[in-house]
Curated annotation (Swiss-Prot):
Gene name of this polypeptide: der
NCBIfam families, alphabetized: GTPase_EngA (TIGR03594), small_GTP (TIGR00231)
InterPro entries: AAA+_ATPase, G_ENGA, GTP-bd, GTPase_Der, KH_dom-like, KH_dom-like_a/b, P-loop_NTPase, Small_GTP-bd
Record-given protein name: GTPase Der
Record organism: Clostridium botulinum (strain Okra / Type B1)
Lineage: Bacteria, Bacillati, Bacillota, Clostridia, Eubacteriales
Positions annotated to bind GTP 2: 183-190, 230-234, 295-298
Length: 439
């Protein structure tokens, strides 16, 4: 089950970006934040009271002129309604209630989504009375904060995580493997999914996904049970291209969040784009299993060396994830389509693989004998013991004399030894080094 998503909504200049940046300033144990395709930050991984969740920064979706405030706010609220599990509705306690606030509140009431009404810019105790007029929005009791001074943020987050308890964390873990198909429009994502569904007889159901442009399809196969997440992307025309791009990116990121395995689809006739690199880079950063599929392979003139050459070029462009698996298919003709879910399952199996501690230490001991750690400064790294502490991705702790002695080249050597011995293709692995005093 994916982490809950929390979106911050509000008209321009109420302090959305200030609030987001304050929360992303390590004040609530941010795990990671990632720039999107646009220059604005879009996502931040957060934790509060042991609840992990994802924050969406909708601060960049703002009108440039006042005459389109209401229409823009309607779109922004719609994005939050579609994607978020909980919505923070931010209003300005200094300026007071505005027509745009009422417009958004009306949409939020209809959505039936949990909303935490937050009155910002309450910098002093005497300003508390400014919050009362916001009861007229019919959203519930407001929480007062000052995002610039970091006042009241704990109370606000307490209210937010209250909504997680029943729906997000107490449910049974879904045993299905979630696969997100990501890539540019018209690369063949929907065609491939339709092909997969058409060839499998045991389809459970099709249900609307969390976003207007995503559809979840459930399918059972001999390789396992899967949820196929199609991120179609926005196709409607708009004068503001960056705004539409941002909507599309947010939707794609939401699908990545929910996925175990991310399949990046590339058009063989076009190659990989900068946006492809950034989107799959996000999946890499948050430790998803990854499969790269080159579609429309039937349209490429080729000889016996073409595939190897194409794969080599892809690996150069995706050098930050050398572990990725590759598959060349044609969704149109069905070429190698039968291997898609099988290969995705292989990625998932490696993503969730556990290695016995005894075998693990034998491999590392042998690796040390073959190549001794280098001296860093005046000390040489000593590795006493290794154990695996988690999966998704496989995570290993090395107990050593001094973590500062680990050289990046030797860390890469240890990772390569683990990969050669245990096959972690399709998934990243994490190596952590912890000091243990020699007895």
């Amino acid at each position: 089950m994916g982490k809950p998503i929390v979106a911050i909504v509000g008209r321009p200049n109420v302090g959305k970006s200030t609030l987001f940046n304050k929360l992303a300033g390590k004040r609530i144990a941010i795990v990671q934040d990632t720039p999107g395709v646009t220059r604005d930050r879009i996502y931040a991984e957060a934790e509060w009271l042991n609840y992990k969740f994802t924050m969406i920064d909708t601060g960049g979706i703002e009108p440039e002129s006042e005459d389109i405030i209401v229409s823009q706010m309607r779109r922004q609220a719609q994005i939050a309604i579609e994607m978020a599990n909980v919505i923070i509705f931010l209003v300005d306690g200094k300026e007071g209630l505005a027509p745009a606030d009422e417009e958004v509140a009306q949409m939020l009431r209809k959505s039936k989504k949990p909303v935490v009404l937050v009155v910002n810019k309450i910098d002093k105790l005497k300003d508390e009375n400014n919050a009362y007029e916001f009861y007229n929005l019919g959203i519930g009791d407001p929480v007062t904060i000052s995002s610039s001074q970091a006042l009241g943020l704990g109370d606000m987050l307490d209210r937010v995580v209250e909504y997680f308890k029943d729906d997000e964390l107490d449910g049974e873990e879904d045993e299905r493997i979630n696969i997100a198909f990501i890539g540019k429009p018209n690369v063949g994502k929907s065609s491939l999914i339709n092909k997969l569904l058409g060839e499998e007889r045991l389809i459970v159901s099709d249900i609307p996904g969390t976003t207007r442009d995503s559809i979840d399809s459930y399918v059972d196969t001999e390789f396992g049970e899967f949820t196929l997440i199609d991120t179609a992307g926005l196709r409607r025309k708009s004068k503001v291209k960056e705004e539409i791009e941002r909507y599309s990116v947010i939707r794609t990121y939401a699908s990545i969040e929910r996925a175990d395995v991310c399949i990046l689809m590339i058009d063989a006739t076009e190659g990989i784009s900068e946006q492809d690199q950034k989107i799959i880079g996000y999946a890499h950063d948050i430790n998803k299993a990854i499969l790269v599929i080159v579609n429309k392979w039937d349209l490429v003139e080729k000889d016996d060396k073409t595939m190897d050459k194409f794969k080599k070029e892809l690996k150069v462009n995706l050098s930050f994830m050398p572990y990725a698996k590759y598959l060349f298919i044609s969704a149109k003709t069905g070429q190698r389509v039968v291997k898609v879910l099988q290969t995705a399952k292989e990625c998932y199996d490696n993503y969730t693989k556990r290695v016995k501690t005894g075998v693990l230490n034998d491999v590392i001991s042998q690796a040390i004998m073959m190549k001794e750690p280098p001296i860093v400064g005046t000390k040489r790294l000593k590795i006493y013991y290794v154990t695996q502490i988690g999966t998704k991705p496989p995570t290993f702790i090395f107990f050593v004399n001094d973590p500062a002695c680990i050289h990046f080249s030797y860390q890469r050597y240890l990772e390569n030894q683990l990969r050669e011995n245990f096959d972690f293709q399709g998934t990243g692995i994490k190596l952590e080094f912890r000091e243990r005093k020699e007895k």
